Amino acid sequence: MDASFPLTGGRWRLDGGFLHAEGGGIAPLSVQRGTPALLGTALLTCETLGVEPPTALLAGDTGNGDGSRKLYSSLAASPSLSGVRGITFHYLFPDLDGHNRVLMALEEAGPKPVLVADAGFMYVAKMSGYADAYDLFTPDAGELAFLADEKAPHP
């Protein structure tokens, strides 16, 4: 997502290949790749299964970590983490301190939700030494090789 995309949380809807924030005021996001594609897929899956759609907290980040730091800070400070049943972390800049603060906040909020690490977030989960706190990693073939090598610091 574009670096100018603000930290935005809440419900989203899918329409014509674009994600729209339920509250409006945010430019629609194309679901062609990345986190918007993951969220679009989750929305379609929930619709098909007839279950409540997820909420999502998104931030623009093109690799310098600014948007990811905002997201980490928001999650670590959020009193609304209690009652969350599952969280999927996807394409966040690998920030060990941010990761660890979020993990501690989740432990304090209890009970621990199901935690899924996908894409780049798997790297920080492994590097932190807390990979066992996660219930599911979803690697592709290259990521799987990295995760299996206990001595590899980065893919």
Per-region residue spans from a language model:
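Small-residue (G/A/S/T)-rich helix-start motifs and N-terminal tracts that mark the onset
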Residues: 1-90, 95-100
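Conserved beta-alpha-beta core of the PfkB/ribokinase-like small-molecule kinase fold
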Residues: 90-155
